[in-house]
Structure formats: C-alpha cells, structure tokens
Amino acid sequence: MLSIDTNILLYAQNRDCPEHDAAAAFLVECAGRADVAVCELVLMELYQLLRNPTVVTRPLEGPEAAEVCQTFRRNRRWALLENAPVMNEVWVLAATPRIARRRLFDARLALTLRHHGVDEFATRNINGFTDFGFSRVWDPITSDG
C-alpha cells in the first residue's frame, strides 16, 4: 500500500510553487488506484499549511482548506487511516539524545502508516522516513516512480 506525504499534497494544491505540475500529475496518477491510503495526520497538517500565510501566498480560509482535505477523504478508492497505538515508540525516540524536535512528527506519521500496512511512501523528505521499514520511500517530484 502507498501513502502520500503532506508536502506532495501541498505542492499539488499550490499553483504558485515550481513543484505544482509534477505533484498534481502524481496525484492524478494515484487518484484511481485502490492501493493508496491517506492519513488523517497528513490532512491535519495540510489544513494548517493551506491556511498559513508564511507558507502559501494565497492562504485559504478554514472552510476552503477543510474542503480541500475532505476531497482527499472522499476518494472511495483510497483507505483513510487514523491513529495507531504508536506513541510508546514515539516517546522512546523522543528520549534519544540530540534528536531533532521535528523528527517526532515524522516518526509518529511513519509508525502510524506502518501499523496500518503502508509499505511505500511518497515524500519530498526522503531522509526523514528511510528508517521506519518502508520498502520504498521516494520523491515523485524528481523521479519517474
């Protein structure tokens, strides 16, 4: 099963960024697949970013950002993943000396996805996800898949 990171979804929505066309094309390829899972953690982050004027030049209002996220939630072919019992593992990572603060968000997402059987992850942040047991982590913006 494949899942898609927030950064890919954001670039697909943001026509002002140079990655837009490639990200949007990747989502079009994925739209009809039945082996895609979207995680609520990713959608919550997408909602926040779509509304943030430091991230996008034309931030959305709450209802508009929510509708973007609902569009992904409504894809009948895609699985919708929520939480998983992964926080004990996340807190073990949190206690690791010199761990980057933001690493915990990626860890929680990765462990949640793996708990639900996701084995492939599309992201711009390849290095943040290589240590979690995915069979494939890749950047669909810079590679052909």
Curated annotation (Swiss-Prot):
Enzyme Commission code: 3.1.-.-
PINc domain: residues covered: 4-123
Cellular-component GO terms for this entry: plasma membrane
SUPFAM superfamilies on file: PIN domain-like
Residues reported in the UniProt entry to bind Mg(2+): 5, 106
Gene3D superfamilies per record: 5'-nuclease (3.40.50.1010)
Transmembrane segments: none
Protein name from the UniProt record: Ribonuclease VapC24
Taxonomic source organism: Mycobacterium tuberculosis (strain ATCC 25618 / H37Rv)
Gene this protein is translated from: vapC24
